[in-house]
């Protein structure tokens, strides 16, 4: 009897990609959804896969992302590691330049422009535009269907349809990336500090203020950060749908939800649209609530939710002013702070939390290394690094979350931990017994 030949990792990853590609192609063929194409024949608008795609199809997409990433790692020579790494900062530099000069906005979504036309209208040097755009094209941002003719790719068209992506780009290039590059200097200068004013952020932006105090004092920074928050909230891993669908909100009935540190209210708006019995109070710092007010004046809230959402200024390091609400929501808040300061935020809620009320924490629960796909873990490690660079904090594993919560008040306990499928964050339900 012939000995069974075991597949090598190279063959395993290749087979996984092939099988998953067939799953997606078959689904697109049977459902009428456009086939994925690198020549843009599938169109510029819409998702790669529709939200209604079966779980097996979305899982196939994730398999391709993971297996292709692992396959590239497998076949990349050690000598190619640094040359390949140089691509990423240049992609970011190109994207910043294009967004700063608003080049994507000058190209019709379904049309073309010449480099000369774009350079003339944007008042930028032609040779710079050509070099920078062609760098971006290697990263699937823009296309050059004919020599010296520029058109949108699916990705760059999305920037036109969603202008706040420009703010996110500028926040990433002008603030987040410089912070990452100052981590060495921060360690050399301050060592194992936990201070919020002794961070890579402070060195990169040249400020003595902690992040959120700087945020409240700098409107331009606030605008960029708001664009980042809006889009991070809408991305798959941090999509609001995981908050909306991941918890049994309907069971609360006519409840009041306090959205602590809720920025411009995107989470509360999404919940209000799905659960008409709920009322919301969105709290954040004065500068953020002012920006939120300006945004609502430009784009009013839908009439169906406007009467059920109110906004107020509040510093969550001070006692919670709203007494006896049913839910206090902390979404993407506590990971910004050290163990001590996160405990202070929770402690400021406790006097206002009635018996049987809930504190819902939606945040990253860091997995043990190697227990999730590399592509997923890499993004979680990005968040962990960003917390270090910005706040001298870090993402927590579940045992750390439990220690934090139980250390605040003996009456608080973790009722359940919900991990919505596809979410990079978990919902930790905390009750006061």
UniProtKB/Swiss-Prot annotation:
Pathway(s): Secondary metabolite biosynthesis
UniProt keyword terms in alphabetical order: Methyltransferase, S-adenosyl-L-methionine, Transferase
Function: O-methyltransferase; part of the gene cluster that mediates the biosynthesis of viriditoxin, one of the 'classical' secondary metabolites produced by fungi and that has antibacterial activity. The first step is performed by the polyketide synthase VdtA which condenses one acetyl-CoA and 6 malonyl-CoA units to form the heptaketide monomer backbone of viriditoxin. The product of VdtA is then O-methylated on C7 by the O-methyltransferase VdtC. The O-methyl group is important for the stereoselective coupling of the monomers at the final step of viriditoxin biosynthesis.
Leading EC class: transferase
UniProt-recorded Gene Ontology molecular function terms: O-methyltransferase activity; polyketide synthase activity
SUPFAM superfamilies from the UniProt entry: S-adenosyl-L-methionine-dependent methyltransferases, Winged helix' DNA-binding domain
InterPro entries in UniProt: COMT-like, O_MeTrfase_dom, SAM-dependent_MTases_sf, WH-like_DNA-bd_sf, WH_DNA-bd_sf
Organism from which the protein derives: Byssochlamys spectabilis
The protein's Enzyme Commission number: 2.1.1.-
One record GO biological process: methylation
Signal peptide (UniProt feature, chain positions): none
Phenotype on disruption: Impairs the O-methylation of C7 of the heptaketide monomer.
UniProt superkingdom: Eukaryota
Gene symbol of the encoding locus: VdtC
PANTHER family named among the record's database cross-references: DUAL O-METHYLTRANSFERASE_FAD-DEPENDENT MONOOXYGENASE ELCB, PUTATIVE (AFU_ORTHOLOGUE AFUA_4G14580)-RELATED
Reaction(s) the record says it catalyses: 7,9,10-trihydroxy-3-(2-oxopropyl)-1H-benzo[g]isochromen-1-one + S-adenosyl-L-methionine = 9,10-dihydroxy-7-methoxy-3-(2-oxopropyl)-1H-benzo[g]isochromen-1-one + S-adenosyl-L-homocysteine + H(+)
Entry binding sites for S-adenosyl-L-methionine: 284
Spans through the membrane: none
Family, as annotated: Belongs to the class I-like SAM-binding methyltransferase superfamily. Cation-independent O-methyltransferase family. COMT subfamily.
This protein's name: O-methyltransferase VdtC
Lineage, broadest ranks: Eukaryota, Fungi, Dikarya, Ascomycota, Pezizomycotina
Active site residues according to the UniProt entry: 335
């Amino acid at each position: 009897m012939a000995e069974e030949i075991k597949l090598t990792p190279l063959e395993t990853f290749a087979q996984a990609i092939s099988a998953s590609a067939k799953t997606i192609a078959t689904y697109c063929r049977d459902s009428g959804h456009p086939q994925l194409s690198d020549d843009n024949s599938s169109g510029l608008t819409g998702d790669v896969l529709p939200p209604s795609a079966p779980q097996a199809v979305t899982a196939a997409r994730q398999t391709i992302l993971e297996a292709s990433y692992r396959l590239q790692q497998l076949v990349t020579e050690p000598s190619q590691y640094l040359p390949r790494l140089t691509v990423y900062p240049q992609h970011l530099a190109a994207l910043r330049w294009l967004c700063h000069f608003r080049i994507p906005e000058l190209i019709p979504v379904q049309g073309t422009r010449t480099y000369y036309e774009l350079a003339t209208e944007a008042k930028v040097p032609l040779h710079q535009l050509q070099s920078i755009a062609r760098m971006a094209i290697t990263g699937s941002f823009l296309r050059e269907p004919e020599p010296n003719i520029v058109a949108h790719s699916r990705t760059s068209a999305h920037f036109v349809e969603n202008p706040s992506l420009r703010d996110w780009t500028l926040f990433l290039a002008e603030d987040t990336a410089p912070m990452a590059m100052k981590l060495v200097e921060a360690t050399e200068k301050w060592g194992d500090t936990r201070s919020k004013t002794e961070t890579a952020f402070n060195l990169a932006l040249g400020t003595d203020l902690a992040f959120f105090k700087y945020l409240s004092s700098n409107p331009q920074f606030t605008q960029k950060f708001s664009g980042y928050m809006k889009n991070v909230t809408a991305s798959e891993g941090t999509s609001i749908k995981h908050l909306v669908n991941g918890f049994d909100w309907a069971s609360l009935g006519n409840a009041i939800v306090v959205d602590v540190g809720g920025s411009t209210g995107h989470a509360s708006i999404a919940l209000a649209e799905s659960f008409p019995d709920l009322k919301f109070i969105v709290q954040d710092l004065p500068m953020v609530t002012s920006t939120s007010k300006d945004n609502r004046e430009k784009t009013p809230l839908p009439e169906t939710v406007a009467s059920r959402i109110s906004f107020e200024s509040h510093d969550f390091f001070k006692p919670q002013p709203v007494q006896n609400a049913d839910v206090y929501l902390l979404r993407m808040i506590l990971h910004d702070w050290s163990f001590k300061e996160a405990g202070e935020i929770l402690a400021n809620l406790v006097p206002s939390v009635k018996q049987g009320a809930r504190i819902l924490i939606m945040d990253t629960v860091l997995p043990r290394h190697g227990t999730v796909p590399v592509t997923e873990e890499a993004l979680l490690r990005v968040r962990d690094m960003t917390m270090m660079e910005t706040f001298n904090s870090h993402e927590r594993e579940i045992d750390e979350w439990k220690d934090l919560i139980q250390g605040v008040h003996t009456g608080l306990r973790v009722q359940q931990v919900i991990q919505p499928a596809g979410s990079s964050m978990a919902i930790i339900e905390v009750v006061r017994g």
